[in-house]
Amino acid sequence: MSNKILLDNIKKLREMTGVGFKDCKIALDETKGDIEKSIEFLRKKGIAKASKKMSRTASEGLALVKEEKGQISLIEINSETDFVAKNLDFINFCKELSEINFKTKSDLNKINDTKMNNGILVKDNLVNLISKIGEKIIIRRANFFDNLSGMNFSYVHSATEKDIGKIISVVKIAGISEADNKDLGNKIAMHIAASNPFAIDKDDIDKNIVDKELEIIEAEIANSGKPPEMIEKISKGKISKFLNDNSLLNQFWIMDPKKKVS
């Protein structure tokens, strides 16, 4: 790993964990530069505490949303630096990609094989853009929702222009009308962007995520010197808090922290 890449990764890891330079370097050396594994390493050692920043992808880029007649699509395109995310060629590519994403209902194979306005396929335009800008650019993920019997609500965080920003959340609610629920739907979308829940309820959180968190918690407690008989008891309390903190209905409402979303 070059010194520049190492320093960039240390900076990212420090921003995500709040941990000092030396410990971040040790973690990156131990994990061969893998940021996600470095976070896990620091948490198991008890050096870093879990935070929402850690669950965000350590990359720049743009997210875009498009809605029309009850249908809504989202797409996220990642770059390596914020500088590229402000590049006009990159922005225009993302805008056209958002239109294609909506038309193809977020089928990534169809997206890549769709011709853009210049007559060139998306996948080839992407290669050309990477060559021109000199940075890795990827279509990270895309999604499409059809909610003709209800309402869609979206929130764009750090919007650069309409329907484009750093983070986008969408709430799909069936069987309601806009007149009665627009304000609530928009606020829930804003809450999700701020709180980043894994699932609607705690029982819906992916078992692999829960198992991994429990493994980290148990390692952290063991490394703190607590006796073995205390590990299970403390782990239960910590994993219960984790499940509540990361499920929408059990999170504290950002508009009124004394209440839960449910």
Model-derived segments and spans:
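N-terminal assembly/interaction segments in proteins that build large macromolecular machines
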Residues: 2-262
